Structure formats: structure tokens, C-alpha cells
């Protein structure tokens, strides 16, 4: 059984990247034939970063489920699609509402992940702008 190869060397690197506002990709290579190995490896990188997540893109059916389970996300409310076949949801009953895009492993065009990332970035920028407008209106 091959252990996953994580591109980032430590959870500290993930936390540092997220803390400085960078989009961060955690890529797991290798054959994960046992769910416990996958969950343990994923937990080491994702769980300490949960409060820093501004959005989440999870790919692959079992992989996406593993990511959501590891974070303690058990309910999503479907809000729409980034594009056909790429559902956009928000967490329910989690630490806070978190935008989530899920993608079947081999589904979509070559730039599907970039489209998902751009969608979440636009959503985050829109949310910040709306919050700033509300704050400005409350000051008046």
C-alpha cells in the first residue's frame, strides 16, 4: 500500500499559505487503498486549517466525501452550479457557512478546477464588497 505524497511538506505550509491569503492546493498522489490512510493523511493537512478556509473545492466522489468528513461537514445546501455538472453548495451546521464546489474526478473541461477557483474568488470578493457596503450604510 502506497502512502500519499503530499506536495506541501507540512500543515504549517498550508496554514502559512492560507493565512497570507493564497489559494492553496493540497494534492494527494498515490494509490490509497484503505480509507483510514487517506483520512489520516488528509486530516494532518486540512483539519488545522479549517478556520482559515474561505471556500473549498473537493474532487472525486470518495475523495470529496473524505475531505468533507474529515472537516466534520455532514450537510450541504445546493445553491446552483458553477457550470453544468459542477455543483455549488454551502455548508449547513458547520463552524460557519462555507462555499463548497464538488467535482467528479474526470468530469469537465481541462480548466474546470480553474473555473471553480475563479467562481469562489468572485463570490468572496462580492461578499466582501457587500459587507463593506452594509458597514458604510450603518455608519451613516
Where do the protein language model's features map onto the residues?
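Active-site catalytic microenvironments in core metabolic enzymes, especially phosphate/sugar-handling
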Residues: 1-140
Amino acid at each position: 500500500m502506497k502512502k500519499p505524497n503530499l506536495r506541501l511538506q507540512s500543515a504549517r505550509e498550508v496554514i502559512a499559505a492560507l493565512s497570507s491569503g493564497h489559494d492553496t492546493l493540497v494534492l494527494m498522489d498515490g494509490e490509497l487503498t484503505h480509507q483510514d490512510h487517506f483520512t489520516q493523511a488528509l486530516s494532518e493537512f486540512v483539519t488545522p486549517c479549517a478556520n482559515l478556509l474561505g471556500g473549498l473545492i473537493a474532487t472525486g466522489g470518495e475523495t470529496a466525501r473524505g475531505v468533507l468528513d474529515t472537516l466534520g461537514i455532514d450537510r450541504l445546501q445546493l445553491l446552483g452550479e458553477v457550470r453544468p455538472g459542477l455543483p455549488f453548495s454551502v455548508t449547513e451546521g458547520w463552524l460557519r457557512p462555507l462555499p463548497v464546489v464538488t467535482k467528479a474526478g474526470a468530469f469537465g473541461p481541462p480548466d474546470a478546477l480553474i473555473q471553480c477557483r475563479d467562481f469562489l474568488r468572485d463570490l468572496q470578493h462580492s461578499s466582501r464588497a457587500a459587507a463593506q457596503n452594509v458597514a458604510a450604510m450603518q455608519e451613516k
